[in-house]
């Protein structure tokens, strides 16, 4: 059996077949969640300490570290990052049109 390789679009969610708008939303949320999880690890925080820092409950931090992406909005994730002193910036670019 031959395996076919495809070039990635750069968005794993798009590659998995999600509609473009949903794929982009999922990509952004996943990046924000990854950054929050990195921050927890870098600072050596317990889930309780992270919850206090982020202004959420410990079960919400558990959902975060378990990757429950559907439970978080971009707004919530940005607010959690802002409470850590982080500055969240976005860059909007026109996508190349595919013929």
Question: Where are these predicted regions, by residue range?
Answer:
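Short amphipathic helical patch at the helix-1/turn junction of helix-turn-helix
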Residues: 40-42
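DNA major-groove recognition helix of helix-turn-helix
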Residues: 65
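Short, solvent-exposed alpha-helical "recognition" segments
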Residues: 68-73
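Short, charged recognition helix plus adjacent turn
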Residues: 89-99
């Amino acid at each position: 059996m031959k395996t076919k390789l495809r070039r990635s679009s750069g968005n794993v969610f798009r590659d998995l077949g999600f509609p473009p708008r949903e794929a982009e939303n999922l990509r952004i949320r996943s990046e924000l969640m990854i950054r929050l999880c990195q921050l927890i690890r870098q600072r050596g925080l317990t889930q309780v300490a992270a919850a206090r820092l982020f202004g959420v409950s410990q079960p919400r931090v558990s959902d975060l570290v378990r990757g429950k992406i559907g439970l978080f909005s971009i707004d919530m994730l940005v607010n959690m990052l802002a409470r850590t002193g982080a500055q969240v910036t976005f860059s909007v670019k026109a996508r190349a049109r595919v013929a």
